[in-house]
Amino acid sequence: MPAVQLLLLACLLGGVGARTAQFQKANDRSGRCQYTFSVASPSESSCPEQGQAMLAIQELQRDSSEQRATLESTKARLSSLEALLHRLTSGQPAGPLETHQGLQRELEALRREREQLETQTQELESAYSNLVRDKSALEEEKRRLQAENEDLARRLESSSQEVASLRRGQCPQAHSSSQDVPSGSREVAKWNLENMDFQELKSELTEVPASQILKESPSGHPRNEEGGTGCGELVWVGEPITLRTAETITGKYGVWMRDPRAAFPYTGETTWRIDTVGTDIRQVFEYDHIRKFTQGYPSKVHVLPRPLESTGAVVYRGSLYFQAAESRTVLRYDLRTETLKAEKEIPGAGYHGQFPYSWGGYTDIDLAVDEIGLWVIYSTEAAKGAIVLSKLNPETLELEQTWETNIRKQSVANAFIICGTLYTVSSYSSPDATVNFAYDTGTGSSKALTVPFKNRYKYSSMIDYNPLERKLFAWDNFNMVSYDIKLSRL
């Protein structure tokens, strides 16, 4: 119907334009009045037939559909423009409309960022959990150490009170007199607890210098009051006993020691340990008790003011003696005050790989302790690589006496000193090595030996003698071991 109306309107307008319009009024058959308005077609001489009218109507319908499609397209574009205008007015940066590919890329980037954030979150949570566990372990260790400290404080206070009591005057005598007791009943009266006071026994402690107990024999070995030296030639070395294993690669080589002349606050059980793999070795781990040493709980960590070199360090009379890195200087470090007390350059001594033991490791200068005192084992150009042995003053590090042996230093794996006699070990890696040479400083002579020595872990980098325990201490391929020994009587 709209199409027909448009067609009639067009005809009407055309008729008006041509000024040929006619207006008629007449009654129809039923008597009703009808008005008729006629306009001549400007382009058609006669009216079209019914089929032609339908074609015109269909064309108008197609035009209407096309106009609707155009209108929908226009609406869509208008919506896009409105969206863009909204973005511009809301402060977002202007630019071309995002394509589907752009949105996909942005979505992928957001997904990657989310995955990275999730990974970082998991790592942080894991690190936090580890820190919480470490904190709990440290707090538990702190509580344990505090409890031990309190126990030690109580024991120290008790000991102080006991010493003070012992230092007071003579104990009071019994008030009852033996004269009041008949002679025939004196033996019985001694056990009459109802009428007799008790007496306290007084105990006095007297410090005696070691020089009064140990006197040197003509050979230079220490002698006790009965005349025996307590020394002899090494005749047997027992099987190694493993006390501890290092946890990290820095513990492949190392040195561990106890003080045979310990002074307060240290005891014969206080143990020190140094891992010697690295270029800047300064940490010295201290353990109050053997149990803490075997369990791996240091009570203190010293940081040396100068780095040390290799495995030749020893502890003696409360001080750590060691070779300074890349030098022929020997240092004395006071463990109580944590300060350097003395240093001395060993004249002509090879260092940093000039005259090491056969296993290497910059073992040019090796310190040792025995019943007589502090020693240093080394070699020089003048000695042509043979072992040189010097007795050191433990306070000043001055050389007191020097011996040159006929044992080539690089031909042996390690050396130690017992009662003034130098002993060497044939191999650092063979399971069935031997103690193969002995040099007696008392007589200035050497001889070959064949005392079996076991390298259980096949890489012994340190062997030292502890005169207090009469044992050998060794570091064998991450493992800290000890050996029982036997000496023949002189």
Curated annotation (Swiss-Prot):
Binding site for Ca(2+): 366, 414-415, 463-464
Purpose of the protein: Secreted glycoprotein regulating the activation of different signaling pathways in adjacent cells to control different processes including cell adhesion, cell-matrix adhesion, cytoskeleton organization and cell migration. Promotes substrate adhesion, spreading and formation of focal contacts. Negatively regulates cell-matrix adhesion and stress fiber assembly through Rho protein signal transduction. Modulates the organization of actin cytoskeleton by stimulating the formation of stress fibers through interactions with components of Wnt signaling pathways.
Organism encoding this protein: Bos taurus (Bovine)
Keyword Endoplasmic reticulum: yes
Extent of motif Microbody targeting signal: 488-490
UniProt PTM: Palmitoylated.
Subunit structure: Homodimer (via N-terminus). Can also form higher oligomers. Interacts with OLFM3, FN1, NRCAM, GLDN and NFASC. Interacts (via N-terminus) with MYL2. Interacts with SFRP1, FRZB, FZD7, FZD10, FZD1 and WIF1; regulates Wnt signaling. Interacts with SNTA1; regulates muscle hypertrophy. Interacts with ERBB2 and ERBB3; activates ERBB2-ERBB3 signaling pathway. Interacts with SNCG; affects its secretion and its aggregation.
Domain spans labelled Olfactomedin-like: 230-489
Biased composition (Polar residues): 173-182
A GO-annotated cellular component: mitochondrial inner membrane
TM helices/strands, residue ranges: none
Site features described as Cleavage, chain residue numbers: 212-213
Ranges for region Disordered: 152-186
Compartments in which it is found: Secreted; Golgi apparatus; Cytoplasmic vesicle; Secreted, Extracellular space
Disulfide feature: 231-419
GO molecular function: metal ion binding
InterPro entries membership: Olfac-like_dom, Olfactomedin-like_domain
Protein name: Myocilin
PANTHER family assigned to the protein according to its UniProt record, in alphabetical order: MYOCILIN, OLFACTOMEDIN-RELATED
